[in-house]
Amino acid sequence: MSQNTTHNVHASTPQNARNGDFLAWPFFDDAHRQLGTRLDAWCTQELHVDHHADTDATCVSLVRQLGRAGWLKYCVPASHGGALDKLDSRALCVLRETLARHDGLADFAFAMQGLGSGAITLAGSDDLKQRYLPRVAAGEAIAAFALSEPEAGSDVAAMACTATLDGDHYVLDGEKTWISNGGIADFYCVFVRTGEAPGARGISAFVVDADTPGLTIAERIDVSAPHPLARLKFDNCRVAASQRLGEAGQGFKVAMMTLDIFRASVAAAALGFARRALDEGLARAKSRQMFGQTLADFQLTQAALGDMATSVDAAALLTYRAAWQRDVLEQRTTREAAMAKMYATESAQQVIDRALQMFGGAGVVSGAIVERLYREIRSLRIYEGATEVQKLIIARELLKDG
């Protein structure tokens, strides 16, 4: 697919004047407000969603497009080609919410550049940062985050993929699965067991180039909302020790630090999906005629819209509180980000379901906007920590504080 290809949506993006109202909240400064406004205008002009069967090509094209436009600069610090001195959670959330409201795959392309390179930003040597981050910011290199395994998803400390020190190299053996951007990534941030200590303390992180001998794509995985996804296999895969992120045995800490930064942005993506669903539901309710009146005239519809709008605002407050606390108060936000991720993804599923119901049979037609949203939101309740895991994290933090 060429980078200038345009596509069609079943309907244009509804222009709901309230979509940007949240930017007036005290969580943001003028730079965030301008960022949201500029990206919304860019998305309206440049993103024309009609994803073709070749999801890989579409995703690669979106990464290049986001890079050329400068949006990927917010995924890395200014010292290595980025837009801001350090990663800004509020900017990441505003960007993801806006992209998700327009195009879920564009949000995915942006998000994986940040998540896939975040460990380098946080723990990489100067050499690693210089070699990888400017290319990520320009959209010239596609990043991936390789943490999950066939028998170690949420239980990260149970991972079995190993790296054995051999002179000035490590030899990686094992598998990773559910790897977003798997098959199209230029490099992977891989977390493996190096054995310095039992459990989480014996994990290290490495940057592994996609063309490294011994690394293969064992399986491409198809899911309900198509995006590049794969199972990776490492078989006697030699990686230079200089590719390690941080000290040996610090990989679990690096992974958790990375997820803490980007978890609130998952909530923001869910929020973008929910806002779009609310817009679509409102438009449908006001235009659909039945029994001599509009759908919006029915009290049941009004009650649903009231619940939907309240859920959207509640999710936004939790999401941007977490981002603000990290940016402004410089606080650790493990609990707050988990709350935001849990509530925003769960409530977005409900908002989208109610919007789809307003369309009746038209809502489940393949390719309809609400049908696409229904498929896209489901995975957000699972990846980067399933809802059940977020509840455990919240409880753990409460008990620790108590």
Question: Regions from the language model: what does each represent?
Answer:
Residues 104-127, 153-156:
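N-terminal glycine-rich flavin-associated loop
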Residues 109, 136, 151-154, 178-181, ...:
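Short Gly/Pro-enriched turn/cap motifs at secondary-structure boundaries
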Residues 121-124, 164, 190-194, 207-209, ...:
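Short beta-strand-to-turn element immediately C-terminal to the catalytic PLP-Schiff-base lysine
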Residues 142-165:
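A gly/ser-rich beta-alpha-beta helix-loop segment of oxidoreductase catalytic cores
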Residues 169, 173-216:
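A short core secondary-structure module
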Residues 235-254:
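Long, acidic (Asp/Glu-rich), low-complexity accessory segments flanking structured domains
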